Curated annotation (Swiss-Prot):
GO molecular function: DNA binding; DNA-binding transcription factor activity; nickel cation binding
Protein name stated in the entry: Putative nickel-responsive regulator
UniProt similarity note: Belongs to the transcriptional regulatory CopG/NikR family.
InterPro entries documented for this protein: Acetolactate_synth/TF_NikR_C, ACT-like_dom_sf, Arc_rbn_hlx_hlx, CopG, CopG/NikR_regulator, Ni_resp_reg_NikR, Ribbon_hlx_hlx, TF_NikR_Ni-bd_C
Role of this protein: Transcriptional regulator.
The species this protein was found in: Desulfovibrio desulfuricans (strain ATCC 27774 / DSM 6949 / MB)
Any one Gene Ontology BP term: response to nickel cation
Classification via SUPFAM superfamilies: ACT-like (SSF55021), Ribbon-helix-helix (SSF47598)
Source species taxonomy: Bacteria, Pseudomonadati, Thermodesulfobacteriota, Desulfovibrionia, Desulfovibrionales
């Protein structure tokens, strides 16, 4: 962190009390660190709405014995291979697999890929989380 700038924040007590509780639950050492995280989150969301590059993770849980699901998932991934940095495949039990894809690229394309994979028949659960590459973020 470069030069620190101090500024005052005025909040209604009805907003401050739950904020302080949030800070305690999340183990923030002080309000300033919590506010910095909130600002970073807003900046990342703003960047995601632009055409800037981002990163993300896609987590899928599926039964690999279902139909032709494994082949379909791999085929879809190959169609957008330039977005996929790496994958992790875990056998949860005899039937269920957990697959984690680390993505990097244009947010719209990453979201579209995630939507395609999550929508495949046989995928039991899927979650996409977008984030920043860290550029231009203090």
């Amino acid at each position: 962190m470069g030069n620190l700038a101090r500024f005052g924040v005025s909040l209604d007590q009805d907003l401050l009390e739950p904020f302080d509780e949030l800070c305690r639950r999340k183990s923030y050492p002080n309000r300033s660190e919590a506010i910095r995280d909130l600002i970073r989150k807003a900046l990342v969301e703003e960047k995601w709405n632009s055409d800037a590059h981002g990163a993300g993770t896609l987590t899928l849980v599926y039964d690999h014995h279902k139909n032709d699901l494994s082949r379909r998932l791999v085929q879809i991934q190959h169609d957008d291979h330039d977005l996929i940095v790496t994958t992790l495949h875990v056998h949860l039990d005899h039937y269920n697999c957990l697959e984690v894809l680390v993505l990097k690229g244009e947010p719209k394309r990453m979201r579209a890929l995630a939507d395609k994979l999550i929508a495949c028949r046989g995928v039991k659960h899927g979650t996409f989380t977008g984030t920043t590459t860290g550029e231009d973020l203090a």
